[in-house]
Amino acid sequence: ASADLLPLYVSSTATASFFIDGKSLSIADDGVVRYTLVIRGSGGAENVSYEGIRCETAERKLYAIGRNGSEWVRSRNDAWQVIAENALNRQHAVLFKEYFCPPGEVRPGLDQIVRSLRRGAVMR
């Protein structure tokens, strides 16, 4: 539901709007933070993906892509990829550094991540 979408500020130059589905957020026993990412383009198109970020190795993984608003299709490229700080995939770097795995700090719990996303502010 739209009420569960938490806005994610990516950059002042981003042309799309980014959201994390708060109900999808989880931290697994393997330490991977899993979440549903919703990207809305300026023209109204929406992309939905189920992803994970592994703090220990600074990597991300795309598990599945949403299709037709009701089904998931498994990603064809489900290999772990190093998180790069570039304009194309900046949302992953923001989630990694500012919300899920802040450098030099204790890893936040799920409640803290959700609170920070709700506030629209990083945890520092």
Task: Put a short name on every predicted segment.
Residues 21, 54, 108-109:
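Alpha-helix initiation/capping motif
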Residues 73-124:
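C-terminal partner/receptor-binding element of secreted or periplasmic proteins
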Residues 4, 30, 58, 67, ...:
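Alpha-helical structural elements
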Residues 8, 20, 35-37, 60-63, ...:
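Generic structural hydrophobic/aromatic packing signal, biased to beta-strands
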Residues 5-8, 25, 37, 62, ...:
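Generic detector of leucine side chains in alpha-helical contexts
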Residues 53, 57-84:
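A short, surface-exposed interaction/processing loop segment used at functional sites
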Residues 1-46, 50:
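N-terminal secretory signal peptides
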